Amino acid sequence: MGPLHHAVAGPAGGRPVLLSPGLGGAAGYFAPQMAALTARFRVVTYDHRGTGRSPGRLAPDHDVPAMARDARAVLDAAGIERADVVGHALGGLIALQMALDAPDRVGRVVVINGWDALDPATRRCFAARRAILAGGGPEAFVRAQAIFLYPAAWLSAQAERVEADEAQALAHFPGAETVLTRIAALEGFAIADRLGAIGHETLVMAARDDVLVPYTRSERLAAALPNARLALAPEGGHAHSVTRPEAFNRALLDFLDRD
């Protein structure tokens, strides 16, 4: 398998931070964080295998451990031995897997709307998204995505922006087979019995109105990790790093800047 597309930004002497996006897989998800992070950190972004600028057919059994190996390969390509890892949803699962598989490569961990085992509510959402993709194709899947990501009031206020984002997502849709394989990887991730082995400083972030991943799942994750703290936003949805970037960035920087 070929190398993944990645980019490095920020001061050469800054502490490295790897950003790993969610199901969509595109590095651009973290655009609202880049200015704040690159002012002081050496930030590595990348597109997951099979998405964005990292094309390629996924093996049917492509899973989170394979994605964690990809993330380590990105660090290798960037010449970075150890980095803090910030991951949204699937990216957060990758961060946890990296901490388990290669603990010396990982500094601090940030898990945004993630989990240690799939929640029944999340399973229901994924079943609905698979049905939308099967019945309506890529356009229906992409248009429905915003309902799972954003609060209704924000979605209403940002309708033009969302439509532009949807056009971009549809133009770069990775294909149904890739999307379904990545959803299966999310559904198969289960490390509840291994959380005690993750001693890294960890920030678990969530929004109370996330309809895709209940915030209670983040509460349980933070409670089970030996060295974790929880940051709950009152609102913002599954993509609260996008809908409430100022508050999100403050909480993120407060954690990453700790001595």
Curated annotation (Swiss-Prot):
Q: Answer yes or no on keyword rRNA-binding.
A: no
GO CC terms for this protein?
A: membrane
Q: Which residues form the AB hydrolase-1 domain?
A: 16-118
Main enzyme class: hydrolase
Q: Which reaction does it catalyse?
A: carbamate + 2 H(+) = NH4(+) + CO2
User: Which Pfam families does the record associate with it?
Assistant: Abhydrolase_1
In Gene Ontology terms, what is one molecular function of this protein?
A: hydrolase activity, acting on carbon-nitrogen (but not peptide) bonds, in linear amides
Source domain of life is Bacteria
Keywords of the record, alphabetical order, are: Hydrolase
A GO biological-process term: uracil catabolic process
What InterPro entries would the database entry show?
Answer: AB_hydrolase_1, AB_hydrolase_fold, AB_hydrolase_sf, Epox_hydrolase-like, Pyrimidine_utilisation_RutD
EC code(s) of this entry: 3.5.1.-
In the UniProt record, the signal sequence range is none
Record keyword Hydrolase present: yes
Would you identify the family this protein belongs to, as annotated? Belongs to the AB hydrolase superfamily. Hydrolase RutD family.
Q: What does this protein do?
A: Involved in pyrimidine catabolism. May facilitate the hydrolysis of carbamate, a reaction that can also occur spontaneously.
Q: Which NCBIfam families match?
A: RutD
Q: Kindly provide the name given to this protein in its UniProt entry.
A: Putative carbamate hydrolase RutD
Biological source species = Methylobacterium radiotolerans (strain ATCC 27329 / DSM 1819 / JCM 2831 / NBRC 15690 / NCIMB 10815 / 0-1)
